């Protein structure tokens, strides 16, 4: 059977009529210059600031500069495969990261991609890395304590949920140790922790993750890692990505703690990007908006009002100083943004006082309202006595003949300094801190040798846990020292002192 030519023509016409080519309209541009993690692109006039762009080979970029005839874009990932003339597409989306409980226990990069080899993360939600901070009406003043487990901090520079407390000090003074101890102490407190490592050595980050795993802290922690080998754009977005992950829990009415370790390296990465994008340099060659870089990040930490769920996001930014210079550009910026600072000193660290907190210039501007009453009752005199001790110790170096009152004050001060020492990774619950500091400020340690103070503390706490557990239970539940409880605590200290043999 043969087909006639007109039948063939009719079949072809039918097929042509039915043919539908799916049209895909994409806004695309061309790379005109690339290098050092920066690309200049021509032809994307409608691009938005902060928009995600797609380069060939599944590499993404983020728009930072919008100029008359081209746009400046930072490349989030390996940029060696990108060349001039490549086509770049708009995605129409602002840079987002996966958020939600699926990330807990994982180590991810700033784009939310897993780095721990435990398989893909099937997050159901995404959040833009840049989002506006909650307004005044949505907030509530800080009033709940966030215990760090460190006696020196919880007594003298208390931190509340929703606060921003800066940890500042030279390199190797124990800044990360304070942050890691705080994470370990959140066990069982229903606080999700996000540790953001910016520009750290990969071995250091691996060490932190191992420590958290050993103490069971990875069950409620997300680690965002942008190591020193990553390109500057990833270091720049890492804190914002970590903050977005924390905000998910904040708006769900839960409590989150975000640690940025450290923001000095983020500022350096941002300076690098700004100079490459030909933005005018300012003081110390940082761009003019370096204050806004950190303020818009730290303002996202908040304690929400009950109408908005009552969630909280606490921020502990870390800043590294050079030779103890707190008055440099970035440290002063971040000090003015935060609600107080914990200043760690290398001199104290090397003299064996660890955590090496300088009580004189460490402050917490809002944490006092969050401190439990029992701690306020015992720690009120602690800061004053320590300050007097430091002043007298400086004078005592010049004269040997001191009157009895001065000598007694110096002796008390030495024991207070000793009692505030604490080993790493051994956070202490608040009721035990109250009992120990109570003994120190009320002079019960004055007749104990300085070398035996920590041994006394260990024995006394063991005695309280076994013989007088009801005292600790009452402090924990009532959160205040009544006259009756104070009398029983004094009695317990007296009873233990009789049995204590150094």
UniProtKB/Swiss-Prot annotation:
Its EC number is 7.1.2.2. The keyword Ion transport applies. The keyword Cytoplasm does not apply. Its main location: membrane. It catalyses: ATP + H2O + 4 H(+)(in) = ADP + phosphate + 5 H(+)(out). Signal peptide: none annotated. The record marks 362 as: Required for activity. It is a peripheral membrane protein. Keywords: ATP synthesis, ATP-binding, Cell membrane, CF(1), Hydrogen ion transport, Ion transport, Membrane, Nucleotide-binding, Translocase, Transport. ATP binds at residues 169-176. HAMAP family: ATP_synth_alpha_bact. F-type ATPases have 2 components, CF(1) - the catalytic core - and CF(0) - the membrane proton channel. CF(1) has five subunits: alpha(3), beta(3), gamma(1), delta(1), epsilon(1). CF(0) has four main subunits: a, b, b' and c. Produces ATP from ADP in the presence of a proton gradient across the membrane. The alpha chain is a regulatory subunit. This is ATP synthase subunit alpha. It comes from Heliobacterium modesticaldum (strain ATCC 51547 / Ice1).
């Amino acid at each position: 059977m043969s087909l006639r030519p007109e039948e063939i023509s009719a079949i072809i016409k039918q097929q042509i009529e039915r043919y539908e080519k799916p049209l895909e309209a994409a806004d695309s541009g061309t790379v005109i210059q690339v290098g050092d993690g920066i690309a200049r692109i021509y032809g994307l006039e409608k691009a938005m600031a902060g928009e995600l762009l797609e380069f060939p080979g599944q590499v993404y970029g983020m728009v930072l500069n919008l100029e008359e005839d081209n746009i400046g874009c930072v490349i989030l990932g390996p940029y060696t495969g990108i060349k001039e003339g490549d086509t770049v597409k708009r995605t129409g989306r602002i840079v987002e990261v996966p958020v939600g409980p699926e990330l807990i226990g994982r180590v991810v990069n700033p784009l939310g991609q897993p780095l721990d080899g435990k398989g893909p993360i099937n997050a159901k939600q995404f959040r833009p890395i840049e989002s506006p901070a909650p307004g005044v009406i949505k907030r509530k003043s800080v009033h709940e304590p966030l215990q760090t487990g460190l006696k020196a901090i919880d007594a003298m520079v208390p931190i509340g949920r929703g606060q921003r407390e800066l940890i500042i000090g030279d390199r190797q003074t124990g800044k990360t140790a304070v942050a890691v101890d705080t994470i370990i102490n959140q066990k069982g407190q229903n606080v999700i922790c996000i540790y953001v490592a910016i520009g750290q050595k990969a071995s250091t980050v691996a060490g932190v993750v191992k420590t958290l795993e050993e103490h069971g802290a990875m069950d409620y922690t997300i680690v965002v890692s942008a190591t020193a080998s990553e390109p500057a754009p990833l270091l720049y977005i890492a804190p914002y990505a970590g903050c977005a992950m924390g905000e998910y829990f904040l708006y769900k009415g839960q409590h989150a703690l975000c640690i940025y370790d450290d923001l000095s390296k983020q500022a350096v990465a941002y300076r690098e990007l700004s100079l490459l994008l030909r933005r005018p340099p300012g003081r110390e060659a940082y761009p003019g908006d370096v204050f806004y870089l950190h303020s818009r990040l730290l303002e996202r930490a908040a304690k929400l009002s009950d109408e908005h769920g009552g969630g909280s996001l606490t921020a502990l930014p870390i800043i590294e100083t050079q030779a103890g210079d707190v008055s440099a550009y970035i440290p002063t910026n971040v000090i003015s943004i935060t609600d107080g600072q914990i200043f760690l000193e290398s001199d104290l660290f090397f003299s064996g006082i660890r955590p090496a907190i300088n009580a004189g210039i460490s402050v917490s501007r809002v944490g006092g309202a969050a401190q439990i009453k029992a701690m306020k009752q015992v720690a009120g005199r602690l800061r004053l006595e320590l300050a007097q001790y430091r002043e007298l110790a400086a004078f005592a170096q010049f004269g040997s003949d001191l009157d009895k009152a001065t000598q007694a004050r110096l002796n008390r001060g030495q024991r207070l300094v000793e009692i505030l020492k604490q080993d790493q990774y051994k956070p202490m619950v608040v009721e035990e801190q109250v009992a120990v500091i109570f003994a120190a400020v009320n002079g019960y340690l004055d007749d104990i040798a300085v070398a035996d103070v920590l041994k006394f503390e260990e024995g006394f706490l063991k005695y309280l846990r076994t013989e007088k557990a009801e005292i600790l239970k009452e402090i924990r539940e009532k959160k205040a020292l009544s006259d009756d409880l104070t009398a029983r605590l004094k009695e317990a200290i007296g009873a233990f002192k009789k049995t204590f043999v150094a």
